[in-house]
């Protein structure tokens, strides 16, 4: 293992997408998924919900390490209804049917523990999906992609063909808003871009 491969951050998530996004900005991580209760509180606003879960994941994930620890959570929101991961086929089809032809919000919370204590923020991105036909929704479910995705779709996967427009952070919809994440990591002393040779 080279020094640039040595983890500088603990990621309190099993999401391969979040790990890949962090790798894209040169941050090597060790993965320690945090298993927490993700039930929304009564009348909890979506932004407060995802930020609370991100903070709790970072707190749980930080146990037993001196590394800064990142927690994150994403929710798809229609009105004030929070859509998490679908429970089953029927739930996924109901979610995709509700999102069909709408502009909805994808709200992502991030939190990082470290020398500066617990730092957190959230990002709201507006996504417009075209009208989806019932046979498309069924075929998409059969692809297996919706199973572990908030709102039952993955913007970086097969569902990319459903997306008419994005207003905000594309990486946040994938799983981690890189601009805001980089700011929090820098404040906690985490180096970005790994150890890259200087440009002559």
From Swiss-Prot:
* Keywords for this protein: Cytoplasm, Hydrolase, Nucleotide metabolism
Catalytic residue positions: 73 (proton acceptor)
Site, as annotated: Important for substrate specificity = 17, 74, 156
HAMAP family membership: Maf
What organism does the record attribute this protein to? Chromohalobacter salexigens (strain ATCC BAA-138 / DSM 3043 / CIP 106854 / NCIMB 13768 / 1H11)
PANTHER family from the UniProt entry: BIFUNCTIONAL DTTP/UTP PYROPHOSPHATASE/METHYLTRANSFERASE PROTEIN-RELATED (PTHR43213), BIFUNCTIONAL DTTP_UTP PYROPHOSPHATASE_METHYLTRANSFERASE PROTEIN-RELATED (PTHR43213:SF5)
Q: Domain of life of the organism in this record?
A: Bacteria
EC number from the UniProt entry: 3.6.1.9
Family assignment from sequence similarity: Belongs to the Maf family. YhdE subfamily.
Q: Name one GO biological process term.
A: nucleotide metabolic process
Show the GO cellular component annotation of the record: cytoplasm
Question: By its UniProt entry, which Gene3D superfamilies does this protein fall under?
Answer: 3.90.950.10
Q: Which reaction does it catalyse?
A: dTTP + H2O = dTMP + diphosphate + H(+); UTP + H2O = UMP + diphosphate + H(+)
Which cofactors are named for this entry? a divalent metal cation
Q: What does this protein do?
A: Nucleoside triphosphate pyrophosphatase that hydrolyzes dTTP and UTP. May have a dual role in cell division arrest and in preventing the incorporation of modified nucleotides into cellular nucleic acids.
- Spell out the InterPro entries in the cross-references: ITPase-like_fam, Maf-like
Q: What is its main location?
A: cytoplasm
Q: Does the keyword Protein transport apply?
A: no
Q: Carries keyword Zinc-finger?
A: no
Where does this one sit in the cell?
A: Cytoplasm
What this protein is called in its record is dTTP/UTP pyrophosphatase
Q: Which GO terms describe its molecular function?
A: dTTP diphosphatase activity; UTP diphosphatase activity
């Amino acid at each position: 293992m080279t020094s640039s491969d040595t983890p500088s951050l603990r990621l309190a998530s099993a999401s391969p997408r979040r790990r890949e996004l962090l790798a894209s900005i040169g941050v090597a991580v060790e993965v320690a998924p945090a298993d927490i209760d993700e039930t929304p509180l009564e009348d909890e606003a979506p932004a407060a919900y995802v930020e609370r879960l991100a903070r709790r994941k970072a707190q749980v994930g930080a146990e037993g390490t001196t590394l800064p620890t990142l927690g994150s959570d994403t929710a798809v929101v229609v009105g004030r209804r929070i859509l998490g991961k679908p429970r089953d086929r029927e739930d996924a089809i109901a979610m995709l049917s509700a999102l069909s032809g709408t502009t909805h919000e994808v709200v992502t919370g991030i939190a990082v523990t470290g020398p500066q204590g617990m730092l957190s923020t959230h990002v709201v991105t507006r996504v417009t999906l075209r009208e989806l036909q019932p046979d498309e929704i069924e075929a998409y479910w059969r692809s297996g992609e919706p199973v572990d995705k908030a709102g039952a779709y993955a913007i970086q996967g097969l569902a990319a063909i459903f997306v008419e427009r994005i207003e905000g952070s594309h990486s946040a919809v994938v799983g981690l808003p890189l601009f805001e994440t980089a700011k929090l990591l820098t404040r906690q002393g985490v180096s970005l871009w790994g150890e890259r040779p200087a440009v002559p």
